[in-house]
Each structure stands twice: as structure tokens, then as C-alpha cells.
Amino acid sequence: MSLLSDNIYNKQAGRDEPKFKIWRNAGLLLTYKCNAKCEFCYYNCSPQQGGLMSVDMAINAWLSLKELAGDGAPAVSKVEPKIHITGGEPFLYWEHLLEILQEAKKNNLGPVDTIETNGFWATDEKIVEEQIKLLDEFGMSRLKISCDPFHQEYVDIELVKQLASVAKELLEHDRVLVRWEKYLDKPVEMKNITADERNKFYVEALKDYPCRFTGRAADGIAELVASQTVEQIAARNCSNAFLDAKGVHIDPYGNIFSGTCSGIIIGNIAKRPLAEIWENWQPSSDKIIETLFNSGPAGLLDEAIEAGYTQSKLYAGKCHLCTSIRQFFFDKGLYKTVLGPAECYFL
């Protein structure tokens, strides 16, 4: 188990300065492939994307988190290290998902905290029952079901209702999370409507449930709610986003993203253990990360504009500006070791 003092940045920070917190949870992006192509995707997942995290990588990531946060962590933080499995859509690779859970159980890694799905596969009640029972048997703590206007463009709401109903019968209600329950009770018809009607539902959903504008979300729907000038955004840096991140996301290729900052690679678990990456992380290790840490995305503007970036009048927020500039740098082939993989950007 690592201590706060094991990190390079923390060693140099003053006693009263904020410290770089130990990552205590990790999301395993099983794949970037998804049956849907949601407008608010934090990555750029779609049926055309790929990648599949190997069983070995998933187990190594799980072990690596336990080594970093440690079984001793609860005595200090009262927070157990947690793993959740997401995507893309994990249920596209059902047998592979089961194999990961089997190996985790065999290695006594404890339960997977959450498995996420959009419910596209819940076409038969018997199949749903069988799969939920298997997930329960292999130690899944909670099932998280996506339910919102964005997903319902691609997934029949009746399938989502069937999945939620069966899951709540077989598991305790607090082990089934529907995001968002409002749209399960009162679905929004997203098919056979005009573009204006669709955009109206998007905006209403974003008002009720704020979204982070990274990945595909920064390309389309962000424009619908863009209301902040660069001057307003410039006052906010990203130091807290890095220092206070509760965990990381690890993609199918081993790339590690801090918190929810998709497309900004801070390490690769295929090359170094998570504990070693955490212990050696400091903002000065990379130019882009150092700029974001100290000045936020507005700090990248001068370089981007000089290289040909066209600044918009308004942005939906700090993450929208950041993703827009990073997309420009990515298109230019700049900062290749940090900006990636391609599945987080538009080609």
C-alpha cells in the first residue's frame, strides 16, 4: 500500500498545500466498441470502434489497484479500493466479461463494484435472468443501467425496462442503479422525430443531469449549451481535477486517464504498475499536463492559435475548451505520447 508521502509531487509540496490523492478506484474500459453512438459519449465509442482488454490486463489492473490503495486502506480512509467495468458496451463481449470475473474470483480479488450496460442485450427474460444470476454468483456488487434520451436513440426502452425489472427482482433494489430513473418511468421518444425536437430533448436532459463535455460530447451537443467565454473559463485551472481524482480509467490498450479526463494519457499499465505510475506522477512531467494543471485549457490557447486553431466565441465549459484544443493538437500530430488513443478523438 502506498502512502501520500510516496508520491514525488507530494514530497515537494508544502505542509499546507493540497496533496495528490491516492487512487482508490479504477474503471476498466473493456472495449471502445458499442452498439450505440450516443451524442454525449465521454469517449468516441461506436459500432465502428474496437479494442478489447485482455483478461490478463484486467486482472493485472485489479491487482495493481489493490497494491496501490491496499487492503490496509480502509483503516486509513474507510474506503475500499473499487473496480468497475465499463466501455463501450461490456455486454458485447459477454463470455470475455465472465472470464475476467472468474479469474478475479479465483485470485480472491473481491467483488467488482459496478458493471455498466445500456441493456441492448435484454431481449429475452430468461436470458436476462441467467446472466444476472451469473454476475451475482461471480461477485458483482451493483449493476448500472444507462437510461436517457441519448441512449434511447439506439436502445429500445422496453429492453431497458425488462432488464431493470428482472435485475431488481433478483438483486436488492440498491444493487441496481438506473441512470436516470426519471427516463425509465417517463421515457422520451427519440426515434422518428425532427432534429429540432431531438435537440430540445438533449438540452432538457443536460439541464437536469449535467454532462462533462469530452469525447463526442464536445463535438455536437456542447454547442447547444455553449454559454461561457474564454475569459470566464480562463480563471479556472485543472489542479483540483488532477489532485482530487478519486481514481482512474484504464482503456483496452492499458492507457490510463486521470478521473474522467478521457484522451489525456498519464501512463500505461502494460508498461508500469499503477502504484509506480502514481508514485512518479507530477504535473511537470509533461508540458500539456503542466499547463492544464497551472493555467487550465485557456493556457493552451496561444500555442493553438499560433498553429492555426480557430477560437469559438462560446464554450460549454472548461472541458469543452480543453477537448476542442486537444482535438486540434491531435489532428496536427502533436503531443502523441499524451493525446490519445484515436478512439477518444475524431479522425
Listing of model-derived features with the role each one plays in the protein:
Residues 2-111, 115-117, 122-127:
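Conserved alpha-helical substructure of the radical SAM core
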Residues 133-281, 335:
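Radical SAM enzyme [4Fe-4S]-AdoMet core and its adjacent flexible, acidic
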